[in-house]
Every structure is written in structure tokens, then in C-alpha cells.
């Protein structure tokens, strides 16, 4: 084997292979495969040996992040959202060189099919010669920005959102860095494509459009082998797992194994919006069957063809999964439960919140983003949270989670007992207003919201009886905020706050146009899915989107950069307050209670800083010492999709 340099010799006799390098190399042995080493002429040399996890770095390249404040402490965490930057991808600038040795690069043909390192037509002339790419690409060399421009042009040619979704997923499988650069720079246009509402349709048709597997699938057939399956995943330094069992996908119900589109979409946002490196993210679907007859009878369905398991069988598989994750990835891996049905969502969160770093976005993430919107809305309507009365349509994960966080915030502001602050919040479920006379028949998570009141069966009657100042929909039932409901809200509120949170768009309690029209332009409105601006009486109203994507990427980043070992409710309150602080007077003047997504990475950095600060304050952070400038530190830890130069 030819050496890179005659100085600073590093040798290995593993599998009969030896090499030399002029600079430090990180080494780890994997199974034998064909790799390419660089000879003295600068060209890769084909050889059969072991894969080398290493990068020839600039000797001056920083290993740890130093925040902007020159007076601040130097944190011990390496860059990239707290994940070791083995290849120098985040600490390197475009002028530094990296060597893509994590996979086989014995041929240029293979390199072009590796989404983690492929640059397409952006490979330079030198790289084409060095990595056997000459002739495998057209002669033109284009830059990253032109590639983004071309891809956006191509995507906009599709009129059907699902086709745009498929184009984005194809790009992710082909060129990871181009995918994330495209998404980051066009987030407002592409967010509804890679996530709600389009991802819902993608999950419904996942078996039909399925091409390449993404993430891990763990089924009942794998009981006793979960740890082995986790070890099959090629990336070993996982920091965030998003897991679903597919039972309650958005407002679409039980989609079984085809719910995988949700973890995949969520984790793409962890990277694009929160800066967590893609290699540190792992989407997982737990397949315990489905009760959806349409799926079971679909010849293209990709999951187990059996009725959904429950009880002991379900609990044992989930317990094995949680134990295996902790054993394989350690104490500080974040496990986000996603789209579990109510009965499992609450039980899993309660069971594992004291033993694992767990987060339920449907319960906690939704609550945090809604609370942020309410804090912002108070600047438009006046008063404090304690001055308002809240009525929810929907008493599931989202509804009760939001209600509890509102009650916690009021308790924090007023020093009143939580039992008292809950009395300002009323919930309606499928059987009507939740009152004390129904206590014996209520599910355990609804019981704290059973107040003294006569039974009310119809939602409109509940609105008229309670006379709330804030109306929140989390029912998953479309068109339930009727004209009569909105008019009733407008009759006893000068500026009624109406939040129609259910996803996707078809399940929204009302549209933006309906809310503004029926309230005669007086409502403060936000929704879970995006709506176009509305013109009413010569004025244009731009509604806000109460999207969990405001919260969970920054929240996760905050947990990682602090090395948090548990999630505490005060961290959720801190995230809400941080998001509300990002709404400016200009946004208020336009009727917005959430900031635009165009600046989402800076918003996420501020949220991460607040969450990390709270983790340090509560003694739940393990990454020491604490950086003095947490915002700058969070920004410096974020993954960049810029191309790296290859030797």
C-alpha cells in the first residue's frame, strides 16, 4: 500500500493491511470490505481490507466548538449536535479536505450511489480524477446553489403534492446534502411537502410508493432479537430516535407499518430545522399489526397482516425495545414517541419518563407550541393567562397535554395550586362536556378535567355555557368549528382566540377563511396545517401555523448540547417562552402569533439555549462545563449541508 506521506507513520496489520498517514486518524474495525486508500500520486488505490472510520484532517482544524464570546468557557462537547464529528464534516470549512472512508469508495460508480457523499455534477475536476469519476459524469461542473435552483425548478413542475413528496424523498436517497440545503433554504414552501399535510397521504399510500427502506422495522416476529436489529443499523452514534407504532397517524387513524413516513419526516426536520446531523437520527416503526381492514386487504401493504396486538404482548415488545435502545445507545439518546394511540401514549410516557430520555411530541410538543402561541396572543388581547377561560374540543393526547401545560404555566405565574388553575380549562370529548358526574366512566387522563357543571352533550351548547375566551380544537374531526360556533365566540369576545389544530388540512376544525369571515375579521386564528392568506373586507389576513416543527427540533438540540438525561416539564415551559420571545411587533401588526419559518434555525437555537439552560439549572445536564453563551454554542453545533472537498 502506498503511503500518504513519509512522516508520522501510522501502521496496522489488521487483515494484512498496512498504511501510513501524515496526520491523525480515527480508527475502528468493521467487517472486511473493499476500500480505497490514497497513494503518493493522490489517487485512491484499490485494495481488499477493512473499512476505516477516519479522516485526514487539517492539523489546525478545531476539535471542539468555541462560542463567539471570547470570555466564555470552552465546552467539551464536539460539534454537530453533541455527536462526535468523526469525519470533520461540521468543523471543517469548504477549504478543508475530508476523506469519505466510512463506506466503500473503491469505484466512482459506488460513490455516485452513496447519498452521504455524492455531490452529483458538483464534483470538481480534481475530485473526478482522484475518485474514478472521470467519464461517469457529464463534463460540466456546477455549484451547490445551481443544483438547488434546478431542483426547485423541477419540483415546482409537479402540481400534485404527493409527486413533490416523492421527488424530495428520491433526492434524499440520492444526495443527502443537496436535500437538506434545498429544504433549509425553501422551508416555508417545502415543509408542507416533507411533513404535514402531504406526509399523511404518503403514509396512506406508503405500500404503493415504497422504493427503498428507510429506518428500522421491528415487528412482533422479532421478539427477543430487538438488540440484534438495532446493531444492524450502520450508524452507531445515534442521538435521536423517533418511533411510532402507526396506530394514530395524524388524524388518519391506524395505518400500521405504513406510518414509517412520520418518523422519517420528523427526523428530516430535526436535521433541517434543529441542526442534528442526519447520521445521528434513527426512524423506527414498531409493527404489532393493524386493525385497518383496508390495509390488511391491500396487496401492497408492507406490514404484518394481523390484527393489532395489545396488552401483555404489546408491553413486552415495547419494554424489550426500550431496554435495547438504552443498552445499545446509552442513557442520553432521545426517544421521541410519535403518533401512538391515546391509551398507549400516556402509559408509555408515564412508564419511561423516569428511566429514559423520552418525549412525546403529540402530548408535550403540541402543548409547548400552543402555549407559545397563547403567550404571544396575550399581547394582542391583553391580560394574563389566568384572566382567560379555555375550552377544548378533543380530550386526547394533544388536548389534555396542552391543557396541562397551560395549567402549569398559570400556576407558575400566580403561585396557585395546579388543582385550582385546572378549573379555568374545560374539555369536550365525544360524549360532551367533561364534568364530575361522568367521573367514574372517564379514562384516567381525562379525570383531572372533570369540573362541577351540569352535563352538556352538544359542543355548541358547551361554547354558549362556558363562554370561553380561547377555543382550541384537537379532535381530529374536520369542520366542527361551525359558523354558529365561531359566531358565538365572537358574540362574547372582541377578539376571540381560535386555534384549529387538527391535521391534516382535511381534518382541520375550520379553515382560515371561515374563521375570519364568520368572526368578521376579529379572530386571532392559528391552525395545525397551513392555509393561504385570506382577504376579507379589503384587508389581507395571514394566519399563523401552530406547527410542532417550531418546538421539537430546537427542544431536541437543547437536550443534546446539554447532555440532558431526563425531560422535565419546566423545559417545555422554557421552550414555549423562548418561541414566544421570537414574535416581533411587525409580526403582531400582521396578526401573527408565531414567527415566520424563514428564520427557523435561529429560532431553534434560542429554544435550544433556553432548554439547555433549564437542564443545567435542574441538575439534569451531563455535558460540563456549561457554556456561557448557549445561543452561540447551539448555533455552532448545527449541521451544515455544505459540500465538503474530497482528497
From Swiss-Prot:
Its main location: plastid. Its EC number is 1.1.1.40. Keywords: Chloroplast, Metal-binding, NAD, NADP, Oxidoreductase, Plastid, Transit peptide. CDD domains: NAD_bind_1_malic_enz. NADP(+) binds at residues 391-407. One of its GO terms (cellular component) is chloroplast. Pfam families: malic, Malic_M. Pathway: Photosynthesis; C3 acid pathway. The chloroplastic ME isoform decarboxylates malate shuttled from neighboring mesophyll cells. The CO(2) released is then refixed by ribulose-bisphosphate carboxylase. This pathway eliminates the photorespiratory loss of CO(2) that occurs in most plants. Homotetramer. This is NADP-dependent malic enzyme, chloroplastic. It comes from Flaveria pringlei. The gene is MODA.
Amino acid at each position: 500500500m502506498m503511503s500518504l506521506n513519509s512522516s508520522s507513520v501510522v501502521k496496522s496489520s489488521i487483515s494484512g493491511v498496512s498504511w501510513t498517514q501524515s496526520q491523525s486518524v480515527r480508527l475502528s474495525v468493521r467487517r472486511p470490505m473493499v476500500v480505497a486508500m490514497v497513494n503518493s500520486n493522490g489517487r485512491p488505490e484499490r485494495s481488499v481490507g477493512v473499512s476505516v472510520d477516519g479522516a485526514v484532517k487539517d492539523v489546525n482544524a478545531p476539535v471542539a466548538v468555541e462560542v463567539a464570546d471570547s470570555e466564555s468557557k470552552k465546552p467539551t462537547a464536539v460539534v454537530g449536535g453533541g455527536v462526535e464529528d468523526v469525519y470533520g464534516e461540521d468543523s471543517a470549512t469548504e477549504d478543508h479536505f475530508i476523506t469519505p472512508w466510512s463506506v466503500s469508495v473503491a469505484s466512482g460508480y459506488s460513490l455516485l450511489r452513496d447519498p452521504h457523499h455524492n455531490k452529483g455534477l458538483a464534483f470538481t475536476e480534481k475530485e473526478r480524477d482522484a475518485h474514478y469519476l472521470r467519464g461517469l459524469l457529464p463534463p460540466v461542473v456546477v455549484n451547490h446553489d445551481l443544483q438547488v435552483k434546478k431542483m426547485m425548478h423541477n419540483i415546482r413542475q409537479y402540481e400534485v403534492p404527493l409527486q413533490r413528496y416523492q421527488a424530495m424523498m428520491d433526492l434524499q436517497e440520492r444526495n443527502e446534502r443537496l436535500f437538506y440545503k434545498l429544504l433549509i433554504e425553501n422551508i416555508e414552501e417545502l415543509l408542507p411537502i416533507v411533513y404535514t399535510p402531504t406526509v399523511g397521504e404518503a403514509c396512506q399510500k406508503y405500500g404503493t410508493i415504497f422504493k427503498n427502506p428507510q429506518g428500522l422495522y421491528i415487528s412482533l416476529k422479532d421478539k427477543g432479537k430487538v438488540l440484534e436489529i438495532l446493531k444492524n443499523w450502520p450508524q452507531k452514534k445515534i442521538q435521536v430516535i423517533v418511533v411510532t407504532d402507526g396506530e394514530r397517524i395524524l388524524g388518519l387513524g391506524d395505518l400500521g407499518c405504513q406510518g414509517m413516513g412520520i418518523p422519517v419526516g420528523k427526523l428530516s426536520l430535526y436535521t433541517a430545522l434543529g441542526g442534528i446531523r442526519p447520521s445521528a437520527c434513527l426512524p423506527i416503526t414498531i409493527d404489532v399489526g393493524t386493525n385497518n381492514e383496508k390495509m390488511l386487504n391491500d396487496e401492497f401493504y408492507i406490514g404484518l397482516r394481523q390484527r393489532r396486538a395489545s396488552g401483555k404482548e404489546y408491553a413486552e415488545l415495547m419494554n424489550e425495545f426500550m431496554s435495547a435502545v438504552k443498552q445499545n445507545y446509552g442513557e442520553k439518546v432521545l426517544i421521541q414517541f410519535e403518533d401512538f394511540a391515546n391509551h398507549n401514549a400516556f402509559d408509555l410516557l408515564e412508564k419511561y419518563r423516569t428511566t429514559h430520555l423520552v418525549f412525546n411530541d403529540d402530548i408535550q410538543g403540541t402543548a409547548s407550541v400552543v402555549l407559545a402561541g397563547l403567550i404571544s396572543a396575550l399581547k394582542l388581547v391583553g391580560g394574563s393567562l389566568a384572566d382567560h377561560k379555555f375550552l377544548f374540543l378533543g380530550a386526547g393526547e394533544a388536548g389534555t397535554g396542552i391543557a396541562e401545560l397551560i395549567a402549569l404555566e398559570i400556576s407558575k405565574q400566580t403561585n396557585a395550586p395546579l388543582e385550582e388553575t385546572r378549573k379555568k380549562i374545560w374539555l369536550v370529548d365525544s360524549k360532551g362536556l367533561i364534568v364530575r358526574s361522568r367521573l367514574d366512566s372517564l379514562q384516567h387522563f381525562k379525570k383531572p378535567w372533570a369540573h362541577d357543571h351540569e352535563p352538556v352533550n352538544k359542543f355548541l351548547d358547551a361554547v354558549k355555557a362556558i363562554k370561553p375566551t380561547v377555543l382550541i380544537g384537537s379532535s381530529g374531526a374536520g369542520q366542527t368549528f361551525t359558523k354558529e360556533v365561531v359566531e358565538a365566540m365572537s358574540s362574547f369576545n372582541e377578539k376571540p382566540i381560535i386555534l384549529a389544530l387538527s391535521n391534516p388540512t382535511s381534518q382541520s376544525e375550520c379553515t382560515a377563511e371561515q374563521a375570519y369571515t364568520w368572526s368578521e375579521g376579529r379572530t386571532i386564528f392559528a391552525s395545525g396545517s397551513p392555509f393561504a392568506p385570506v382577504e376579507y373586507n379589503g384587508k389581507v389576513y395571514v394566519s399563523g401555523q401552530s406547527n410542532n416543527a417550531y418546538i421539537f427540533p430546537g427542544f431536541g438540540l437543547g437536550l443534546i448540547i446539554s447532555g440532558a438525561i431526563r425531560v422535565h416539564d419546566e423545559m417545555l415551559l422554557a421552550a414555549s417562552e423562548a418561541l414566544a420571545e421570537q414574535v416581533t411587533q411587525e409580526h403582531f401588526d400582521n396578526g401573527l402569533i408565531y414567527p415566520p419559518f424563514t428564520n427557523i434555525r435561529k429560532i431553534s437555537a434560542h429554544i435550544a439555549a433556553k432548554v439547555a439552560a433549564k437542564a443545567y439549572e435542574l441538575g439534569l445536564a451531563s455535558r460540563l462545563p456549561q457554556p456561557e453563551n448557549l445561543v452561540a454554542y447551539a448555533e455552532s453545533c448545527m449541521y451544515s449541508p455544505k459540500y465538503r472537498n474530497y482528497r
